[in-house]
Design a protein with these regions (language model features):
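Alpha/beta enzyme core
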Residues: 2-182
Length: 182
């Protein structure tokens, strides 16, 4: 049986390490499943599989295709699928439609969103619909054009405070897990 968000939260409470890796295909997922607590199907497949410079060209259909392949190889780890660029930013209703489609098609346990304060209502909407949300803060590759590339985050006290405040707000509004990327 796959790990639930409650299992991950219990591990955190018990100060256990959570091993998380990324997979894009059945074979990789099958190999790493017994060594991981959390497997992400990342929109980084745009870089790794499609040879693109950024993750911005990845579609919901791409995520479903790779998510389903990975899902077939995951028996124990928690499976999380990235919500690609512009699949959740336009409205909470659009986010719910796309997240529901991803969860139903891939049998994943959660979806991951790169968040800002603007996406907090979307986290609430998904959580209220029974879709566990992993909130991604800090270096968010979907903001590539905003930052002028992949720029390290959290270098200043102001940026550190922003990331911490955003993380707490996400958790308060229904995010099951928060991932911080530097």
């Amino acid at each position: 049986m796959r790990k639930s968000v409650q299992d991950l939260q219990s591990m955190k409470s018990n100060k256990e390490r959570i091993v998380a890796l990324t997979a894009y295909d059945f074979q990789t997922a099958s190999i790493i499943d017994s060594y991981c607590d959390f497997i992400l199907v990342g929109d980084s497949l745009g870089n790794v599989f499609k040879g693109e410079e950024t993750t911005l060209g990845v579609t919901v259909d791409d995520m479903i295709y790779h998510g389903l392949s990975v899902s077939r190889g995951v028996k124990n780890a928690h499976l999380c699928i990235d919500m690609p660029f512009m699949s959740y930013q336009s409205s909470s209703a659009e986010a719910l439609k796309n997240a529901g489609r991803i969860i139903k098609a891939t049998k994943a346990q959660s979806v991951k969103l790169e968040i800002s304060f603007d996406t907090i209502p979307t986290i609430q909407k998904l959580a209220n619909a029974g879709i566990p949300v992993v909130a991604h803060v800090g270096l968010c590759p979907q903001s590539y054009n905003v930052y002028g590339g992949y720029k390290k985050q959290g270098k200043t006290k102001t940026n550190q405070d922003y990331i911490l405040t955003l993380s707490k707000e996400a958790e308060k509004n229904g995010a099951s897990v928060v991932v911080i990327e530097g």
